[in-house]
Amino acid sequence: MPATAEAADAATQATDAFSTKLEENKLPEGQERGPEEEEDDDDDETPAPGDAEKKKKKKKKSGAKKKKSKTAKAVMEQTEPPSIGLTKMFPNGVFPVGEVQQYDETKFDESRKRVTGEELRERERLIQEKDGFNYNFIRRAAEVHRQVRQYAQRTIKPGMSMTEIANMIEDGTRALVEVNGFESGIGFPTGLSLNEVAAHYTPNAGDKRILQSGDVLKVDFGVQVKGRIVDSAFTMNFEPTYDPLLAAVRAATNTGVKEAGIDARLGEVGAAIQEVMESHEFEAEGKTHQVKCIRNLQGHDIAPYRIHGGKSVPIVAVPNLDVKMEEGETFAIETFGSTGRGYVVDSGECSHYARQANPPHVSLRINSARQLLYTINKNFGSLPFCRRYLDRLGEQNYLLGLRHLVSQGVVQDYPPLADVPGCMTAQFEHTILLRPTCKEVVSRGDDY
């Protein structure tokens, strides 16, 4: 779910006052934490940066016993459509590790270059102890995303309605994540943006739109476990005309993932993305198209229970943007390409909303607004939602109250974002975790 330039500024201001333990989202006292990270076999074998040579010289202690590690192993196959919860498939509570990439150590600050591998592994343990975080939370969310999206890729066909597609993805997500209030559930509404619409479209009640064979469909959905959100997106087309557009955007996203890392400057990441994206051009319908970055859409960091944490990752060069990525942060690296002008504006009926992380204290004069805010706090907190989710909860005649919450700054609306009519847009996105010892692309799969 992308950040616009305007939304990024607002998120940055909110971050200054943000506490990861929002009262609305507080987990029950006494809740048990998941398995400790050192039980994950894959991670134990991940060398810390600069540690490989030391390992070669280190002598193995005679008679030393290695602690037996748990591995991520599914004990059953998933159904079609997906319906088996992940905790039943992985009963030991250990979920598949994402793609591990080593950092480019030349980008590290001097202070970090002096840190030993042992110290980095200790930091990794400490990060997981903070607020009860465990890497298996976000890995569980990522495995849900992989299984649901791969079924969606096999199933989505022209002739299906947008509502049918959204329900299929969200029903699968709810089943596999074993939805349980703020403990686990949907991370944000399923985006199904078509053609020139790049982001933030999901069908409202009564939407009759049908997927056509010539459409370019962006599928963007999120999964959360204990507030750790996996945000990942892909694009589908059903005719080969715009295959080169999809290839350009996918390559740009992979470039962003490669360039990201501890101490990486966000402006430099954006410049690398733009260079790759805009090196592509192709012929379609008798015209030559240079792929353009949609310059006012950006990637972003992800905070607990907040899809936009406060930092934005541009997809174009931004001179003098020296903000750095930091150890322990989670980022959504997403890029958007267009055959249009490379700039989006609000377009069409709004469906996406989110309560502000730190809403202002205002007097709500409309009764329906007060009631609706209670429903939002109880069911979503600061997580994004859509009108269909309110319908599902039995809310009725809520539009006046919803508009009042938006006008008072309590709720932020996210209208569909579109480039010029007639153009095509594409999106690919991955969630990455900047661990002390390595970069983990948690949402990576065989599909993208």
Swiss-Prot record:
Binds 2 divalent metal cations per subunit. Has a high-affinity and a low affinity metal-binding site. The true nature of the physiological cofactor is under debate. The enzyme is active with cobalt, zinc, manganese or divalent iron ions. Most likely, methionine aminopeptidases function as mononuclear Fe(2+)-metalloproteases under physiological conditions, and the catalytically relevant metal-binding site has been assigned to the histidine-containing high-affinity site. Substrate binds at H200, H308. It is found in: Cytoplasm. Its main location: cytoplasm. Residues 1-17 have a biased composition (Low complexity). Residues 1-87 are annotated as: Disordered. Residues 55-71 have a biased composition (Basic residues). InterPro entries: Creatinase/aminopeptidase-like (IPR036005), Met_Aminopeptidase_Type2 (IPR050247), Pept_M24 (IPR000994), Pept_M24_MAP (IPR001714), Pept_M24A_MAP2 (IPR002468), WH-like_DNA-bd_sf (IPR036388), WH_DNA-bd_sf (IPR036390). It comes from the Eukaryota. A divalent metal cation 1 binds at D220, D231, E429. One of its GO terms (molecular function) is metalloaminopeptidase activity. Coiled coil: none annotated. The keyword Kinase does not apply. Residues 35-46 have a biased composition (Acidic residues). Its EC number is 3.4.11.18. It catalyses: Release of N-terminal amino acids, preferentially methionine, from peptides and arylamides. Keywords: Aminopeptidase, Cytoplasm, Hydrolase, Metal-binding, Protease. One of its GO terms (cellular component) is cytoplasm. A divalent metal cation 2 binds at D231, H300, E334, E429. GO terms for biological process: proteolysis. Its cofactor is Co(2+); Zn(2+); Mn(2+); Fe(2+). Residues 21-34 have a biased composition (Basic and acidic residues). Belongs to the peptidase M24A family. Methionine aminopeptidase eukaryotic type 2 subfamily. NCBIfam families: met_pdase_II. PANTHER family: METHIONINE AMINOPEPTIDASE 2. This is Methionine aminopeptidase 2.
